[in-house]
């Protein structure tokens, strides 16, 4: 599940984190500096360094911010899930999430990829991201169980891992390559990552095509 940045007033700390997330998405980890965040956030030079003295503290704060936003989104999903939800309804979420993550606004997905890479070398980032993974797996399992599926956190954790891999491929590979290997239909891919972890479910029609542009 992909996080969306919240609208409305935010604290200066959150503003700096949101700005850093945008920079990660656009310029990658190498573009993430204290001065770059200050400039993009429109705050006096030195502000970011006062809040986050080291680069690692910036990255850890970004991961924590994304986790907090994600957990808020998960809570909203819980609150708005209709009682009569079924397996097909749940399956249909994934093509929509994939399209949003790749075509509509890839900022969060691109930043997440950068943070995953940083987490390999930085325990603080790794710990912050683990909260997002655990919250998502738990919420996904609860949602699928509400739809009558015997899903576990392992199933939904695997689903999220599949989703992340597919999203990265769609963002990184040329259209011709995606077409050649059969990864050019976001709708089918969204249904596919769901069905791959819930093999007993005949969810979705599987024959709809959603334009990736």
Predicted stretch roles:
Residues 15, 19-61:
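Helix-turn-helix
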Residues 74-109, 156-159:
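Hydrophobic alpha-helical connector segments
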Residues 126, 130, 145-213:
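Hydrophobic/aromatic-rich alpha-helical bundle segments in the mid-to-C-terminal region
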Residues 64-70:
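Short, basic, alpha-helical segments at the C-terminal edge of helix-turn-helix-like DNA-binding modules
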Residues 103-113, 120-147, 157:
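Amphipathic alpha-helical packing segments from all-alpha helical-bundle domains
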Residues 1-7, 150:
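Short, intrinsically disordered or compositionally biased N-terminal tails of bacterial proteins
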Residues 81, 119, 170-174:
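Secondary-structure edge/capping motif, primarily at the C-terminal ends of alpha-helices
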Residues 15, 19-26, 72-76, 80, ...:
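Solvent-exposed, amphipathic alpha-helical segments
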């Amino acid at each position: 599940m992909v996080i969306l940045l919240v609208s409305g007033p935010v604290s200066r700390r959150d503003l700096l984190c949101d700005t850093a997330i945008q920079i990660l998405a656009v310029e990658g980890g190498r573009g993430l500096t204290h001065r770059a965040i200050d400039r993009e956030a429109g705050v006096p030079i030195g502000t970011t360094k006062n809040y986050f003295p080291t680069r690692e503290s910036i990255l850890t704060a970004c991961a924590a911010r994304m986790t907090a936003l994600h957990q808020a989104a998960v809570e909203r999903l819980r609150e708005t899930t209709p009682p009569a939800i079924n397996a097909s309804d749940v399956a249909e979420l994934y093509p929509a999430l994939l399209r949003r993550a790749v075509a509509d606004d890839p900022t969060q997905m691109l930043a997440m990829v950068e943070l995953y890479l940083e987490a390999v070398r930085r325990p603080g980032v790794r710990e912050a991201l683990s909260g997002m993974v655990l919250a998502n797996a738990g919420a996904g399992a609860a949602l699928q169980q509400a739809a009558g599926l015997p899903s576990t956190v392992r199933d939904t954790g695997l689903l999220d891992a599949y989703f992340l891999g597919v999203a990265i491929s769609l963002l990184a590979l040329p259209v011709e390559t995606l077409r050649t290997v059969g990864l050019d239909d976001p709708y089918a891919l969204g249904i596919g990552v769901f069905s791959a972890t819930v093999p007993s479910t005949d969810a979705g029609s599987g024959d709809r095509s959603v334009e990736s542009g």
